[in-house]
Amino acid sequence: MVSWCASVQAGIVLNTTRVIYQGNDKEVSLGVHNSGGGEILLQSWLEAPALATGNDPATQRLPFIVTPSLTRMAGGGKQLLRIIHSGTDMPTDRESVLWLNVQEIPQTAAQNTLQIAIRQRIKVFFRPDGMPGDPLQAPEQLNWKTGNNDSLQVENPGPYHVSMLKISVRQDDVELASIESQMLAPQQSLHIPLLRKKGGAPLVVSFVSINDYGGQVPYRATLANHESGYASKVMPR
């Protein structure tokens, strides 16, 4: 049995929530800690998002290796995982995203005892060398466009992914749309259905962007009727 988790459980703990792989780096690494008291097997691998490839991620051959891919960890032990790119077969004009899977396989216990494998997944962002722009400013490059009375569109024209939380669209303090989480890939657009807005009052779009360091940065945009606009950081008071 496999249990999926996005946060820490009594077992493996990763020292980061995302990995940024710069194209000119020979390798990147992250740490894993076995917070439990017993010995485990640690299995690690990369896969492409199914949405991006249209194929089963398990069948994809990627120009990366994770080492060690399988290793034993003592209770309380630590392990460094290395991700190495072979230097081929990745887009050179935009950032790519992969999933890093790290799975804890408990040692065999007594007969008739249920064993649960805990798996964590984090994103690996691969950035080719020489890409223009600043990824920390990518949320400000999103183009938000009002359409008819029941739609809003956001387009990412840049080469970087933008990860967002708590997207909210409001008009006169009435919420017209809410999305808990969304990642926009380079050149991707998203159509957001709205509860029917009324009159010509502006729309207020707010969201939280996750930066390279896992930090959460709030943004807000105000859109007049049938106009487009860009979001700005919400500065702390």
Language-model-detected regions and their locations in the chain:
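Sec/Tat signal peptide C-region and signal peptidase I cleavage site
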Residues: 4-10
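Beta-sheet-dominated interaction scaffolds and their linkers
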Residues: 10-35, 133-147
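Extracytoplasmic
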Residues: 25-27, 39, 78, 95-97, ...
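Asparagine-centered strand-capping/turn motif at beta-strand->loop junctions
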Residues: 30-36, 152-158
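Soluble periplasmic/extracytoplasmic beta-strand elements of cell-envelope proteins
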Residues: 31, 41-45, 80-82, 99-101, ...
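Short, hydrophobic/aromatic beta-strand segments
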Residues: 38-46, 161-167, 219
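Intrinsically disordered, low-complexity Pro/Gly/Ser/Thr-rich segments with frequent PxxP/GP/PP motifs
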Residues: 54-89, 173-200
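Terminal connector regions
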Residues: 86-131, 199-237
